Amino acid sequence: MVAEHPTPPQPHQPPPMDSTAGSGIAAPAAAAVCDLRMEPKIPEPFVWPNGDARPASAAELDMPVVDVGVLRDGDAEGLRRAAAQVAAACATHGFFQVSEHGVDAALARAALDGASDFFRLPLAEKRRARRVPGTVSGYTSAHADRFASKLPWKETLSFGFHDRAAAPVVADYFSSTLGPDFAPMGRVYQKYCEEMKELSLTIMELLELSLGVERGYYREFFADSSSIMRCNYYPPCPEPERTLGTGPHCDPTALTILLQDDVGGLEVLVDGEWRPVSPVPGAMVINIGDTFMALSNGRYKSCLHRAVVNQRRERRSLAFFLCPREDRVVRPPPSAATPQHYPDFTWADLMRFTQRHYRADTRTLDAFTRWLAPPAADAAATAQVEAAS
C-alpha cells in the first residue's frame, strides 16, 4: 500500500455538548431528537449540505455472510472457505457479516429492547447519563460533540467495557448513573458485552487465518483489551433526504460488531457509490477499523460508512467497538511487516489525534502518520519553538 499525503489536519477541539460550532445556530439543546419527529420540517442544524446529504443509493453491497461456527467445529474445508470470504471482503471494503456466532438470540433481543426502553424515557431522565465531552460514557442527543455543524438525526448511549476489573463495570455504570431501577438493564448489557468480547476474539482468529499470519497474534493482542459499547437510536424523520443518521466516517478502533434491528440504514462507500447493507436475521455486521488496518499493514481496509434515516420507522442498532489497551504498541505481526507502512503507535496516541484533529475520511492513518513523524523541516521548526519557550 502506498501512503498518500493528505492535507495536514487542522486543529479541532470538540465543541460543548448540544452546540453547533460554526453554524451560527444553536442546536436544540432542550429537546431530544425523538421529540422533533412530529415537526413538519427538521431544524436547520440537522440539515446537511447537498454534497453530503442523502443521494439515491446504489445496488446493495455484495457482502459475504461468513459461518464462524466452523472455528468451533474444526471443519477444515469450512475454515478455508470462511478465510477466503473474509480476505476478499476485507481487502476490498472491510465489511462482512457473521452467522453461527454463538451469541444468544434472546440476549440480543433483550439488548435491543433495552435500547428502546432507555431512549423512550423522558429527556430529563436520559440526561442523568449525559456524556461529558472528551469522555466515552454517556447519553447524547445528536452526538453534537462529534458532528458539530451538521447534526446527525440520532441519540446514543455509550459506555466502556473491560473484563479485567473485579467488578462488572457495565452493570455498575447503569446502577450508579441511572439508579437501582436500571440494574436489570445493566446486567443485560454486561452479559452482552462479555459475549461481544468473546466473539471479537473469535473473529481475530479468523482474521489471522485469512491473512496467513502467526496464529494467536491478534487474539493475544486483544485479550486484555478495552472496548466501547454504543446503543444507537434513529427516530423517524420528517425530511430524511435532508439529513443523515450518522455522517460518513471511518472507525478509528480495531473492529466493530454491529447488531441491527430489522430496519435498514447502514451504507458503505464502495467505488464512489453508497451501497446499502440490509439486515440479515441472526447475523451481525463486522467492519475493519483504522487500528486493524495498521495491524494488517494496510492489507485490510477501513472504509467510509454512514447511516441513513427514514420517515416511517425508528431504527435501533448496537455497536461494539474493540480497542487495544491504551499502552499497547500497534504493529503488524512479523510475517506481515516488511516493509511496515505505518509507524508503531499506541491506542492512546490515536485517540489523542482523533480528538484533536478529527478527520472523517479514508486517509486518517496517513494523516496520523504525518502527525506522529512530521517532515524534517516541520520537526526542526517545532524544536526551535520548544527551545525558545
Curated annotation (Swiss-Prot):
Superkingdom field: Eukaryota
GO biological-process terms attached to the record: flower development; gibberellin biosynthetic process; response to flooding; response to light stimulus; unidimensional cell growth
Binding residues annotated for Fe cation, in chain numbering: 249, 251, 305
Cofactor: Fe cation; L-ascorbate
Tissue: Strongly expressed in leaf blades, stems and unopened flowers. Lower expression in leaf sheath, rachis, shoot apex and roots.
Fe2OG dioxygenase domain segment(s): 224-324
Industrial or biotech use: This gene, also known as the 'green revolution gene' has been introduced by conventional breeding procedures into several cultivars. It provides rice cultivars with short, thick culms, raises the harvest index, improves lodging resistance and responsiveness to nitrogen fertilizer, resulting high yields without affecting panicle and grain quality.
Catalysed reactions, semicolon-separated: gibberellin A12 + 2 2-oxoglutarate + 3 O2 + H(+) = gibberellin A9 + 2 succinate + 3 CO2 + 2 H2O; gibberellin A53 + 2 2-oxoglutarate + 3 O2 + H(+) = gibberellin A20 + 2 succinate + 3 CO2 + 2 H2O
Intrachain S-S bonds: none
UniProt-annotated catalytic positions: 315
InterPro entries: DIOX_N (IPR026992), IPNS-like_FE2OG_OXY (IPR044861), IPNS-like_sf (IPR027443), Iron_ascorbate_oxido_reductase (IPR050231), Oxoglu/Fe-dep_dioxygenase_dom (IPR005123)
Comp. bias (Pro residues): 1-17
UniProt keyword list: Iron, Metal-binding, Oxidoreductase
Major enzyme class: oxidoreductase
Gene Ontology molecular functions: dioxygenase activity; gibberellin 20-oxidase activity; metal ion binding
EC code(s) of this entry: 1.14.11.-
Residue ranges, annotated region (Disordered): 1-23
PROSITE patterns: FE2OG_OXY (PS51471)
Up-regulation conditions: Induced by ethylene.
Biological function: Contributes to the promotion of internode elongation in response to submergence via ethylene and gibberellin signalings.
UniProt miscellaneous comment: A second gene, 20ox1, is preferentially expressed in the reproductive organs and enables the flowers in sd1 plants to develop and be fertilized normally.
Family the UniProt entry places it in: Belongs to the iron/ascorbate-dependent oxidoreductase family. GA20OX subfamily.
The protein's name: Gibberellin 20 oxidase 2
